[in-house]
Amino acid sequence: MGIDLNTVEEEAEEGAAAAVCGELWHACAGPGVALPRRGSALVYLPQAHLAADGGGGEVPPAGAAAVPPHVACRVVGVELRADAATDEVYARLALVAEGEMLQRNFREGGGEDGAGEMEGCDAEKKPRMPHMFCKTLTASDTSTHGGFSVPRRAAEDCFPPLDYKTVRPSQELIAVDLHGTQWKFRHIYRGQPRRHLLTIGWSSFVNRKKLVSGDAVLFLRGDDGQLRLGVRRAVQLRNEALFEPVNSSDSKLRILSSVASSLENKSVFHICFNPRSGASEFIVPYWRLLKSLNHPFSIGMRFRVCYESEDANERSAGLISGISEVDPIRWPGSRWKCLLVRWDDSTDSSHQNRVSPWEIERVGGSVSVTHSLSSGSKRTKLHFPQGSLDTPFLNGNGHPDSMGTENFHRVLQGQEFRGSRSHGVVCSESPGVPNFQSPDNRRFSADMRGYMMPASGPPQRNTEFTYQPIGFSESLGFPEVLQGQEMSQVVPLFRGATFGARTQNDRVVSANSVHRSAAQSGLLASTLGHPISQFTLSSSKVSSPSSVLMFNQATAPNHETVSGTNNKGMHVSQFASQEMLSETVTWPGTQRQTPSEITSNQFALARIPAPPSGAESGLPKRDAGRSSCRLFGFSLTGNMLGEDGEGLDDGAIEAGCENPPVLELFGHSHSTPGALHALCAAAPLGM
């Protein structure tokens, strides 16, 4: 039958409600809408239903039947409807009250296990809509003499195919809306560039539906080939069908009486709700409310809320500032809007200052946790396990003798410990460090810088394994040294100490070489935070790495160092001086001590014979006063210092000189870094 494009055929409300297509109803409702299915459990909140009309309507009228604030119900029927005036979709539910179900779960404290199963089955499964497109109207789409521009792919998917062999391909389309009303449009393919347009009949549809720019129109082609048409408004209009049960005192009395009758007689009562708006907050899935009751909230707890829309999901966060009932006299024990909140984005006026527990999601505990962003650099660093970060311990007291790679933690750059470390030695900032005792009854005393030295015990025993450094490629036992970090100051290992040292080939050498236990497979003691010992250089010339500056001072003090390992394989050092027994010399700024105190309280002393000179060993003798600074194998400071250094003899000098000793890359000690200071003033670190 022919249809006048300027008129539409009206049908009765009952017929329109019966003719609502489920696919079209869900398409108009939107993707974020869940409809309870038949047989599912939900909780009806009469207090929220009465307040849906606004204006403090949650107060029950005089003479109303007494009903609890939470009514557990079973869904026995679902009817899809649409408002004839606004095309807003809503549902009419048939419910049967089952109050004992909720009370039983409250007493038992259960329902948590079944909540996960009910979550997936309570919502009605949405039908698949493969042939559908939705477009937001523009100003040209809603103009009086304009048409509706359809994307090409959407037109080819939803509309019947056009005959492109003709000069001006066109056809007539008939679409049915939610109320069963048929609308006729002329579909044409024209323009430059060519496009699909709906021309005749479109203006009548826009005027009749009162569409404006920003509203959305959707077309859907079902499995039967029928073309359907729906509207989704940007701003929802008031649906009188939803507020009819609560817009007067008489209607409120009727709805409360029907709920009370259902609680007593298991009768059916009906309610209407809009799944797209907040008016449906008086219908809560049973599992959601029970889950919120099993997880109580507290003041100061942080939360977040996710709002689902057609375009995107919005998230908001806030803080619970109080817990109180809205109306404890008329609705005692009600959990509806019982949480007073303070939003993070307080400038947004759309947020309410009260929310329900089932509307929010908890985030952490009552104290807000600030998450730090990791550094952008993916270079990892190693640090020692948590514990005493300032004071190293021997023989398993904090740090084991042999530490594998599984005991190290990886940490991103910028997340290192704040403690001061230099080549594996941990420096303490605490002035008072107590004495410690190892499992083998050996006492250790710590000075103000946190270094541990043996106080008493059996003499140290040298192992058979002797390490001779042969170049930069050797990495056994050495900590990683980056370019620009080759030089560092050596802090005093004890108070009132004097050192003895001798030079060999312009190098300050120790008496013994570094010993390493053959049974120990871990790192050296220096990498575990224990005192650094001196290494013995071989008579052959040690090659300097190409990217590392090596400084040699012939005017350095003469030291004599005895190195060894304890019974656990831990490396320790014993320093001796040629004049230790005759005079006492202190470090600057420290307290003087007698040699006896040093011997009894700090460590055991040992004297060793002086190493042979260069002439005795058969090696060529170089100028003693010459300083060498090499870069890529070439000397840079050959003439920086005077050549008259032959008057220097080997002997004991005081460790408390004006300039502190300098620790070279492989542990050699120098006390006169004049050439180093002159060179560093001209060139920055990291060259």
Curated annotation (Swiss-Prot):
DNA bind region: 133-235
Tissues in which the UniProt entry reports expression: Expressed in roots, culms, leaves and young panicles.
Subcellular location(s) per record: Nucleus
Top-level division of the source organism's lineage: Eukaryota
Induction: Down-regulated by auxin under light condition.
Keywords assigned: Auxin signaling pathway, DNA-binding, Nucleus, Transcription, Transcription regulation
Signal peptide from the UniProt entry: none
GO molecular function: DNA binding
Transmembrane segments: none
Pfam families assigned to the protein according to its UniProt record, in alphabetical order: ARF_AD, B3
Main location: nucleus
Transcription regulation recorded as keyword: yes
InterPro entries documented for this protein: ARF_dom, ARF_plant, B3_DNA-bd, DNA-bd_pseudobarrel_sf
Gene Ontology CC: nucleus
A biological process from GO: auxin-activated signaling pathway
PANTHER family: AUXIN RESPONSE FACTOR 14 (PTHR31384:SF23), AUXIN RESPONSE FACTOR 4-RELATED (PTHR31384)
Cited function: Auxin response factors (ARFs) are transcriptional factors that bind specifically to the DNA sequence 5'-TGTCTC-3' found in the auxin-responsive promoter elements (AuxREs).
Family: Belongs to the ARF family.
Subunit structure and binding partners: Homo and heterodimers.
Protein name (record): Auxin response factor 14
Organism: Oryza sativa subsp. japonica (Rice)
Classification of source organism: Eukaryota, Viridiplantae, Streptophyta, Embryophyta, Tracheophyta
